[in-house]
UniProtKB/Swiss-Prot annotation:
Gene3D superfamilies: Prion/Doppel protein, beta-ribbon domain
Stretches the record annotates as Disordered: 28-118
Membrane topology type: Lipid-anchor; GPI-anchor
Domain remarks in the Swiss-Prot or TrEMBL record: The normal, monomeric form has a mainly alpha-helical structure. The disease-associated, protease-resistant form forms amyloid fibrils containing a cross-beta spine, formed by a steric zipper of superposed beta-strands. Disease mutations may favor intermolecular contacts via short beta strands, and may thereby trigger oligomerization.
Protein name as catalogued: Major prion protein
PANTHER family: DOPPEL PRION, MAJOR PRION PROTEIN
Species per Swiss-Prot/TrEMBL record: Tragelaphus imberbis
Subunit architecture: Monomer and homodimer. Has a tendency to aggregate into amyloid fibrils containing a cross-beta spine, formed by a steric zipper of superposed beta-strands. Soluble oligomers may represent an intermediate stage on the path to fibril formation. Copper binding may promote oligomerization. Interacts with GRB2, APP, ERI3/PRNPIP and SYN1. Mislocalized cytosolically exposed PrP interacts with MGRN1; this interaction alters MGRN1 subcellular location and causes lysosomal enlargement. Interacts with KIAA1191.
One cellular-component annotation, GO: plasma membrane
Signal peptide: 1-24
Main location per the UniProt record: membrane
Family: Belongs to the prion family.
Residue numbers covered by the propeptide annotation in the UniProt entry: 242-264
């Protein structure tokens, strides 16, 4: 008799879960598609100029007026004003100042830094959405993409792009889509950080970009950022649908009752 009841409840649970899945799939996805109403990004019509001006009072990517990537006015990649890669003002590779390289401020421990604790939640989030980039304020690096084939309206620029496209990035930097109100804001920020990071990194290697390069790079990165937004929106929607499914009161009630029957 108990087995008959268990079989009936399993059937009811199966039907309820599939009903909720169907409802979840009908929910609208966040964000719009490419070119769905509204103006495009500010300054796009000016040839040769930067179509993605920085926002706010500081320089590019400066929330509080520091240099590039400086949340509080330190050097590049310095959260609190230390040297490059120095979170708290110590020497390179010194988390809290003092000591020689790799000592972390303690004498007699040459080249034996303490092992950082691993936060499993951060690891899971990075695996789901991309690797978090250190020193870039929570930005993640997307997976490599094929550079899009773009026509710029004249033979010279089309030929120039085909000959130099390998110099432009094939990955973009971005933040989670739930931090933006729409696709335009996501793409604008994605283009700014990606072009700036690629330009700085390449310039340090002795290679410079012309205005034509910057113009083409922005177009290429824009298309890749749109693709990245669509991927992240789909993944965000699927994660939300799963949470809604298993947090539905009827499903919770049925699962609880089924467990009660099995245990009892």
């Amino acid at each position: 008799m108990v087995k008959s009841h268990i079989g009936s409840w399993i059937l009811v649970l199966f039907v309820a879960m599939w009903s909720d899945v169907g409802l979840c799939k009908k929910r609208p996805k966040p964000g719009g598609g490419w070119n769905t109403g509204g103006s495009r990004y500010p300054g796009q019509g000016s040839p040769g100029g930067n179509r993605y001006p920085s926002q706010g009072g500081g320089g590019w990517g400066q929330p509080h007026g520091g240099g590039w990537g400086q949340p509080h006015g330190g050097g590049w990649g310095q959260p609190h004003g230390g040297g490059w890669g120095q979170p708290h003002g110590g020497g390179w590779g010194q988390p809290h100042g003092g000591g020689g390289w790799g000592q972390g401020g303690t004498h007699g421990q040459w080249n034996k830094p303490s092992k950082p604790k691993t936060n499993m939640k951060h690891v899971a989030g990075a695996a789901a959405a991309g690797a978090v980039v250190g020193g870039l304020g929570g930005y993640m690096l997307g997976s490599a993409m094929s550079r899009p084939l773009i026509h710029f309206g004249n033979d010279y620029e089309d030929r120039y792009y085909r000959e130099n496209m390998y110099r432009y990035p094939n990955q973009v930097y971005y933040r989670p889509v739930d931090q933006y109100s729409n696709q335009n804001n996501f793409v604008h920020d994605c283009v700014n950080i990606t072009v700036k990071q690629h330009t700085v990194t390449t310039t340090t290697k002795g290679e410079n970009f012309t205005e034509t390069d910057i113009k083409m790079m922005e177009r290429v990165v824009e298309q890749m950022c749109i693709t990245q937004y669509q991927r992240e929106s789909e993944a965000y929607y699927q994660r939300g649908a799963s949470v809604i499914l298993f947090s539905s009161p009827p499903v919770i009630l049925l699962i609880s009752f089924l467990i009660f029957l099995i245990v009892g």
